[in-house]
Structure formats: C-alpha cells, structure tokens
Amino acid sequence: MLAPRRKTRQLMVGSVGVGSDHPISVQSMTTTKTHDINATLQQIAQLTASGCDIVRVACPKPVDAEALPIIAKKSPIPVIADIHFQPKYIFSAIDAGCAAVRVNPGNIKEFDGRVKEVAQAAGDAGIPIRIGVNGGSLDKRILDKYHGKATPEALVESALWEASLFEEHGYGDIAISVKHSDPVLMVEAYRQLAEKCDYPLHLGVTEAGPKFMGTIKSSVAFGALLSQGIGDTIRVSLSADPVEEIKVGDQILQSLNLRPRKLEIVSCPSCGRAQVDVYKLAEEVTEGLDGLEVPLRVAVMGCVVNGPGEARDADLGVASGNGKGQIFVKGEIIKTVPESQIVQTLIEEAMRIAETMDPEVLAAAEASGMKAEVKVTS
C-alpha cells in the first residue's frame, strides 16, 4: 500500500494546483529556442495534447525574455520561466505573465541580495517561485562546506537556506526541487527535505539520460518517493522528444494508482511457446486503438500457457495459437477468429465496449487526454 500524501502548503501555478490537496501534475520543458515563438507554441501544443499539465521554457537571452509575454498569453497550459545566471530575467518573466518562475540559486549572480526584490515582485503578481537546487550547480559556499560534494545534506541545506531568505521577506509561495543525476542520492535528498518543511516538492532526476536509461532512473526514483507520499509535481528528464517525458510521467502515476488508469494493453514478452508474432500484434493493436481514451484493459497473448488466464483478467483479450485467436470479453470466449482477423476484431470489440461504458466514466477518460500505451508484462 502507498503511504498517505505528505501534507504541504498549497500553490497555484496558473490554473493548476500544486500541493497535497491537488492531484500530482506532470511537467515538461520545451527544447525549442524560446525566442522562436511559433516553434515554442507548437511544441507546447504537442505537449498539451499528450497530457502535459505545466510547461517550462528556458530564458537565457534578452530575445527569449522578449518572447515570454506572447508565449505566456497564448499557451493553453501554465508556463514557468526557467532562470539561470541573470536575475533580471526573473523580473522579465514575472512582468510577462508567466505562471511561475524557477530559479537556480546556485548560479544566479548575487542571488541572495536580490531575494527581497524577487519576493516583492512575485508576491505582487501572485505567482509562486520554485527554488530549483541542482547537484551540478550548487552554491560554492555549500560545496565548500561539504568538501566539494553534492551530498543529499548539501542539496537540502541549500534549498532551505534560500527558502528562509524568501520567508524573511514575507513570501512563502515556494516549491522546492533538489535534483541529482544519481537517483539514490536524489531519493535521499527528497526524503530529508520532506521531513524538514511543508513546501510542495517538484520531483526530478537531472541529466537522467537517453529515453531508455532516463525512464529507468526516473521510474525507480519517483516510485520510491511517491510510494512514501513524497512528491507533488514531477518532470521526467529525457534526452528525447519532450512528449516522451509526459508519456513516462503519466504511466508512472498510473502504475502507482495515483492517476486513473486509462487504456492499457497487456502483452506477453514472447518466448519459444509463442505461436504468433506477439511484438507485431501488440504494436498493431496499440496503433489501432490510439486515441481510445477509456479505462479499458486489453490483453494480447502469444500462446495458451499464460494467454487464457491473462486474457480472462482483462476487459478484452486474445489468446493465440494454431493460426487462430480466441477472443475473450470479461473472461468469456465470444469467438474464435483466423490470425489475420485478430487485430481488426479486437479493435471492433474495444470500440463496442467503449460505447457501452458509463457516460461519466467516458467523460472522465476524455478529460484525461491520454492515449493508448503498451505495458509489457512477464
């Protein structure tokens, strides 16, 4: 069983609530040059369609800051400006109407001395600040204290020190992240942080790597923390299309039952017993059901060993063998079809089942905006 959500203060990032009273949100970051407004808005639209709740954009140059007002206004989801090095861009982002600002206190010039101004501006605008501490860019004072190592204790101390400066100026609409590229150190840092404050926590493994490796690192780290009730918003960092970050993040939450499960395709990993090309069959079924946004479990099994049992546990499934496929609905065999008709039959039955679902269930599924994804089981 999962531990109860850790109680936190509540923030509003635009229209999205962040904190223990709200569902855990999934974020991503654009990979476009922010000053290329059309490209940035196009990517934000793609992220929104994939289920992204909040999007972050980089702001390294004056031309990027100049683009923020249009992007913040036209984006269908809340925009967070990601600020490093130059504190002036914090004020540009606030003036532009961004829903929140992420600051990295480890690399912004003389940040401590600007906290009062930032707190005043953010408070007047009514937007939150995320203090984003990163193992690769810790404040030199903290690094010196911890002998040059970005330990969990160093990450936590840096974050809470900066938060205390904001609190001294009467500003408390703060979220915190303490990211590290090592998921073990990252998990420990968040555990320590969770015990010492009530700020909402943004989870992330920084520099997680390419799609496969990054997915593994983030899944391990997020699973460990979320199962303990720690985490209020997540970003899966991948060296891949940002849409993939949303798919992974959403699936992590669904796997932990922290989001309603949507269309799930269960397929066996295949072995020498398989009497059908399971990989091809699963891919074709997934492609055919893409866009069917309902809580439906479809099993695609390659033989009669695991097939009937797995298919019976699903809403709809097939157990293949001898050039045929037995189609199951809620554990009952409804028909046997030639192998060439399996995909089309499953698609037709899935559509039929979807039409009979409770309208409220369908409405909730449609509101989630998520599409089919393959889940491979063993």
UniProtKB/Swiss-Prot annotation:
Its EC number is 1.17.7.3. One of its GO terms (molecular function) is 4 iron, 4 sulfur cluster binding. Pfam families: GcpE (PF04551). One of its GO terms (biological process) is isopentenyl diphosphate biosynthetic process, methylerythritol 4-phosphate pathway. Binds 1 [4Fe-4S] cluster. It catalyses: (2E)-4-hydroxy-3-methylbut-2-enyl diphosphate + oxidized [flavodoxin] + H2O + 2 H(+) = 2-C-methyl-D-erythritol 2,4-cyclic diphosphate + reduced [flavodoxin]. [4Fe-4S] cluster binds at C268, C271, C303, E310. Pathway: Isoprenoid biosynthesis; isopentenyl diphosphate biosynthesis via DXP pathway; isopentenyl diphosphate from 1-deoxy-D-xylulose 5-phosphate: step 5/6. Its cofactor is [4Fe-4S] cluster. Keywords: 4Fe-4S, Iron, Iron-sulfur, Isoprene biosynthesis, Metal-binding, Oxidoreductase. It comes from the Bacteria. Converts 2C-methyl-D-erythritol 2,4-cyclodiphosphate (ME-2,4cPP) into 1-hydroxy-2-methyl-2-(E)-butenyl 4-diphosphate. Belongs to the IspG family. This is 4-hydroxy-3-methylbut-2-en-1-yl diphosphate synthase (flavodoxin). The lineage of its organism: Bacteria, Bacillati, Actinomycetota, Actinomycetes, Mycobacteriales.
